[in-house]
UniProtKB/Swiss-Prot annotation:
Keywords: Lyase, Membrane, Metal-binding, Mitochondrion, Mitochondrion inner membrane, Ubiquinone biosynthesis, Zinc
Role this protein plays: Lyase that catalyzes the C1-decarboxylation of 4-hydroxy-3-methoxy-5-(all-trans-polyprenyl)benzoic acid into 2-methoxy-6-(all-trans-polyprenyl)phenol during ubiquinone biosynthesis.
Protein known as: Ubiquinone biosynthesis protein COQ4, mitochondrial
InterPro entries in the record: Coq4, Coq4_euk
Cofactor requirements of the protein: Zn(2+)
Localization terms from the record: Mitochondrion inner membrane
Originating gene: COQ4
Any one GO cellular component localisation term in the record: extrinsic component of mitochondrial inner membrane
Pfam families: Coq4
Record: residues binding Zn(2+): H191, D192, H195, E207
Amino acid sequence: MLIVQQFQKRSFIIPSLISSGLSYLSKDIRLADKMEDGELHFPKTEFEKSQNTSRPLFQRPEPNYPGHVPLYNFEKLLMFLGSSIGAFVNPTNNNFIVSLGESTAFPWVLNRLRTQMLNDPSGRQILKERPHMTSKSLNLDELKNYPDNSLGKSYFLWLEREGVSPDTRVPVKYITDPELAFVFQRYRECHDFYHTITGLPIVREGEIALKLFEFMNLGIPMTGLGALFAPIPIKSSQRRRLLSVYYPWAVKNGTICKPLINVYWEKIMKKDIDVLRSELGIEKPPDMRELRKKARSKKKQVA
């Protein structure tokens, strides 16, 4: 009887052990199958994605538009310091002026200009169409045949007299946002029209006067810095002329003038330039070249 009971117990235990062993073995087999199929690992795409999120500390981000050069904040600071010193020591070097302009073109400044453009019909059209000024797009050969006092003819004659071209404007490359980069590029390309409408020449004194006019009208930091520091190293006679004649003119006219960033110059080339000045609220300053000529003549007479 005892033997039978023990046999019955064994007959119960043995199947249980066999069942447990098969279950364990089955788990191992399923585990091996999953490992073979790669189901226990990240999917390949997710793994690669996680690997791509980590990059070297100073790996430059991808550009946001053609020609864009992304900069870290410390690089922008270094560019500002270097270009500001360079522009003060050698203001005729355009590279310093260009770098200083972009390193101080803060987003809040450009956003304010963009808002002004969005609130104006012409400004909105400019933002939508994003035109760029070149000799080809402006058709200079046609402008020279415009009426004598038209904006187009005046612009052409000013380019001829000063020996400059709209093709020399350097593309913006350090401003991060594409639309804000266009806003600053638009200012840069319209600079020669500001010379044309005011009659100020491309001499150091004329550029300084125009910088203050631009700062009062547009609020671009680089123009304010230029108006503040550029008169320091020039001749005392030029500085007196700026402070007595052209700075008061620039403050008054830059303040009351309509925002020049909204002027679609390409669309109004046939407009009479005197009528345009009146519409914009600009009073033409005294002819700087004539004043400089008279000052030199007077100096020779005294000598």
